């Protein structure tokens, strides 16, 4: 008798995705982040669901409903901080996952990569709208500043911003619709994740060597289920250390002040995981130019398959490209730091230099170095 997991129409899908999936035997811990992102998504949806049971999306009561969750709801403070810091963990895993894809040339799987970039955009939109919901000072002013960027679009900009706001400023209508979108988008993300996995399993996983691994594959279970469980335990441990010891470490103190349209905070800045893009936005004096640079800083990921000039897939055997990759990583850390600093000397010039370096490395230097490596290796 054949095993039910191989014959049952539903269980068969799970079996082919997580149990009998042929997996390259040499994939390293960098391949753990896919499953960790799945775990983060589950944590965020569950905690978000419980928060939504007590939250009210009204400008008069939103801030106090969050206070009520933290003070009066059983373990409400825990659920709220797991959700807030879970978002930070989500983005740490996301950026490491993308970095792994860039380093090992996983972007040569076009469909998987492009769906991944769309996923990144969707998750960023979800996180931005979630940050607005507590209706603190930084929520309100962050929403005002970021949505206002759309007014840079020629001709339709102002009308578009007022349409998104549902009025002439960020108010009740804006908060209500942001809550609605923040609730529905994670389910759209889940659907996109399934499409992402569908395309990945069409080709099979990449591996550190970048070579075809058909001759050396092992079943996903038990080898990589155990490995993923270890990763999940480490992620959960670090999340709970953050939540229970310093839950406000990554937040902004301004968000503990209720939103006040008449009082602007001295430094308006988004959450830490958007600071690199915010720094790129601020480094261009022109409003439309800044918005285009902001969008292109993420959209540029879609160009990697086109810009890939190397005869080798990953960077494992390409020391010059490795150096460039780590310079790019350091540049992103610099941009993140600059995004949190006030707009004054010397931060302005550092931000502008780091922004130029970011685009130059990706668009010009990396393809040229790849071609040089081909010549050096006589390929």
From Swiss-Prot:
Binding site for heme b b562: 83, 182
Cited Gene3D superfamilies: Cytochrome Bc1 Complex, Chain C
Chain segments annotated as transmembrane: 33-53, 77-98, 113-133, 178-198, 226-246, 288-308, 320-340, 347-367
GO molecular function: metal ion binding; ubiquinol-cytochrome-c reductase activity
Binding-site residues, a ubiquinone: 201
Highest taxon of the lineage: Eukaryota
Chief site of localization: mitochondrion
Record bears the keyword Electron transport: yes
Binding site residues for heme b b566: 97, 196
Binding note for cofactor: Binds 2 heme b groups non-covalently.
CC cofactor: heme b
InterPro entries named in the record: Cyt_b/b6_C, Cyt_b/b6_C_sf, Cyt_b/b6_N, Cytb/b6-like_sf, Cytochrome_b, Cytochrome_b_C_euk/bac, Cytochrome_b_N_euk/bac, Di-haem_cyt_TM
Biological process (GO), any one: mitochondrial electron transport, ubiquinol to cytochrome c
SUPFAM superfamilies the UniProt entry points to: a domain/subunit of cytochrome bc1 complex (Ubiquinol-cytochrome c reductase) (SSF81648), Transmembrane di-heme cytochromes (SSF81342)
Pfam name, any one: Cytochrom_B_C
Keywords: Electron transport, Heme, Iron, Membrane, Metal-binding, Mitochondrion, Mitochondrion inner membrane, Respiratory chain, Transmembrane, Transmembrane helix, Transport, Ubiquinone
Membrane topology field: Multi-pass membrane protein
GO cellular component: mitochondrial inner membrane; respiratory chain complex III
Subcellular location, record wording: Mitochondrion inner membrane
Subunit structure: The cytochrome bc1 complex contains 11 subunits: 3 respiratory subunits (MT-CYB, CYC1 and UQCRFS1), 2 core proteins (UQCRC1 and UQCRC2) and 6 low-molecular weight proteins (UQCRH/QCR6, UQCRB/QCR7, UQCRQ/QCR8, UQCR10/QCR9, UQCR11/QCR10 and a cleavage product of UQCRFS1). This cytochrome bc1 complex then forms a dimer.
Role description: Component of the ubiquinol-cytochrome c reductase complex (complex III or cytochrome b-c1 complex) that is part of the mitochondrial respiratory chain. The b-c1 complex mediates electron transfer from ubiquinol to cytochrome c. Contributes to the generation of a proton gradient across the mitochondrial membrane that is then used for ATP synthesis.
UniProt record similarity statement: Belongs to the cytochrome b family.
Other information: Heme 1 (or BL or b562) is low-potential and absorbs at about 562 nm, and heme 2 (or BH or b566) is high-potential and absorbs at about 566 nm.
Name of this chain's protein: Cytochrome b
Annotated source species: Petaurista philippensis (Indian giant flying squirrel)
Taxonomic lineage from the root: Eukaryota, Metazoa, Chordata, Craniata, Vertebrata
């Amino acid at each position: 008798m054949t095993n039910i997991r191989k014959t049952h129409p539903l269980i068969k899908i799970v079996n082919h995705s997580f149990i009998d999936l042929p997996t390259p035997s040499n994939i390293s811990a960098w391949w753990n982040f896919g499953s960790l992102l799945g775990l983060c998504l589950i944590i965020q949806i569950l905690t978000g669901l419980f928060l939504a049971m007590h939250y009210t999306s009204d400008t008069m009561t939103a801030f106090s409903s969050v206070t009520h969750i933290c003070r009066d709801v059983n373990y409400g403070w825990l659920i709220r901080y797991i959700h807030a810091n879970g978002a930070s963990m989500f983005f740490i895993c996301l950026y490491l996952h993308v970095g792994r894809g860039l380093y090992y040339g996983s972007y040569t799987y076009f469909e998987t990569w492009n769906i991944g970039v769309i996923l990144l955009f969707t998750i960023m939109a979800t996180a931005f709208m979630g940050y607005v919901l507590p209706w603190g000072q930084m929520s309100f002013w962050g929403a005002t500043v970021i949505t206002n960027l759309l007014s840079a679009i020629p001709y339709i900009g102002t009308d578009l911003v007022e349409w998104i706001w549902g009025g002439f400023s960020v108010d009740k209508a804006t908060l209500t619709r942001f809550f609605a979108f923040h609730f529905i988008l994670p389910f759209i993300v889940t659907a996109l994740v399934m499409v992402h996995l569908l395309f990945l399993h069409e080709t099979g996983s990449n591996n550190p060597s970048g070579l075809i691994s058909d001759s050396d594959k092992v079943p996903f279970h038990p080898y990589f289920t155990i490995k993923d469980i270890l990763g999940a335990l480490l992620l959960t441990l670090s999340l709970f250390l953050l939540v229970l010891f310093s839950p406000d470490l990554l937040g902004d103190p301004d968000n503990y002040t209720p939103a006040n349209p008449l009082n602007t905070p001295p430094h308006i800045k988004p959450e830490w995981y958007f600071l690199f893009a915010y720094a790129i936005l601020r480094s261009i004096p022109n409003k439309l130019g800044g918005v285009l640079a902001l969008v292109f800083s993420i959209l540029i990921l879609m160009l990697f398959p086109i810009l890939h000039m190397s005869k080798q897939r990953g960077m494992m055997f390409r020391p010059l490209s490795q150096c460039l990759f780590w310079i790019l990583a350091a540049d992103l850390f610099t941009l993140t730091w600059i995004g949190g600093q006030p707009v004054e000397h010397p931060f302005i010039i550092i931000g502008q230099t780091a922004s130029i370096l970011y685009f130059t490395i990706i668009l010009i230097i990396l393809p040229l170095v790849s071609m040089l490596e081909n010549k050096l290796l006589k390929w």
